[in-house]
Amino acid sequence: MAETFKHTTVLLDEAVNGLSIRSNGIYIDGTFGRGGHSRLILSHLGPEGRLLAIDRDPQAVEVANTIDDARFSIIHGPFSELAEYVEARGLTGKIDGILLDLGVSSPQLDDPERGFSFMRDGPLDMRMDPTRGQSAADWLMKAEADDIAWVLKTFGEERFAKRIARAIVERNRIDPLTRTKALAELIAAASPIREKYKHPATRSFQAIRIYINSELEEIERALDGALTVLAPGGRLSVISFHSLEDRIVKRFIRQHSRGPQVPAGLPLTEAQLRSQGGPTLKSVGKMMPPDDEVADNPRARSSVLRFAERLPS
């Protein structure tokens, strides 16, 4: 098994409690990670309960395979395909709760060989599943400066995106970037102003990681899938770690809590209005980590937990 890196699960009890677990229910942990949420869910389930876990990181799947529990199964793949996994098992509309813990995990950040961190030197990879897709180094080598700048601005809200993108392209023409430390140093040198208490490469590394892993598109597909597979009364519990993620989750819950929006003045009969359907979700709440959790685990600082409940169709 790969080297073990510590992972402290954020909002562990709160996220699981928000699922209102029934002992014989069927649940999905869409982001197994190192199994913190999964193990707690299993502790609430009775003999007839079931937990389906998903993770696209092979190292996470290795850990999951050590769980010897007939109620538990693990799928190696992206959580965006959860509706397909559920349909293949004949469980569409029967899922009692889904938990998604978004973003990169501590073991992924802490392992320099994964290439996620600007604080530790390693290969410039950043793939959550190293067996699929192109690495960050490969993409940066092929991409145009305008495309890199767009990614840095869109997914990292990096104010010096164009300057950094030009520096990356110029460097790759001479000496290709293959290590995280080299990229972090280049970004720092290209950034004329530094934010207090924040490394100048923070936003760019986040942006490149999000792009390489299609993270925002994955979230959108996973949320759509969750709505399809949840049973009436089923719960959705989602932890996000930055504003781009949380914005998607917040918008999704709000949109489906309102139901179809019919333009004012559109000449529809009452029957036609009813045929448009009503809301399919109910917002159940939002939580932030308590101060003591942030003190123990600084990575929890920016986390937001949102809950929703599936309404009958």
Swiss-Prot record:
It catalyses: cytidine(1402) in 16S rRNA + S-adenosyl-L-methionine = N(4)-methylcytidine(1402) in 16S rRNA + S-adenosyl-L-homocysteine + H(+). GO terms for cellular component: cytoplasm. It is found in: Cytoplasm. InterPro entries: RsmH, SAM-dep_MeTrfase_MraW_recog, SAM-dependent_MTases_sf. GO terms for molecular function: rRNA (cytosine-N4-)-methyltransferase activity. Residues 276-300 are annotated as: Disordered. Keywords: Cytoplasm, Methyltransferase, rRNA processing, S-adenosyl-L-methionine, Transferase. The keyword Cytoplasm applies. S-adenosyl-L-methionine binds at residues 35-37, 55, 79, 101, 108. Its EC number is 2.1.1.199. One of its GO terms (biological process) is rRNA base methylation. Gene3D superfamilies: Putative methyltransferase TM0872, insert domain (1.10.150.170), Vaccinia Virus protein VP39 (3.40.50.150). Signal peptide: none annotated. It comes from the Bacteria. Belongs to the methyltransferase superfamily. RsmH family. PANTHER family: 12S RRNA N4-METHYLCYTIDINE METHYLTRANSFERASE (PTHR11265:SF0), S-ADENOSYL-METHYLTRANSFERASE MRAW (PTHR11265). Specifically methylates the N4 position of cytidine in position 1402 (C1402) of 16S rRNA. This is Ribosomal RNA small subunit methyltransferase H. It comes from Dickeya chrysanthemi (strain Ech1591). The gene is rsmH.
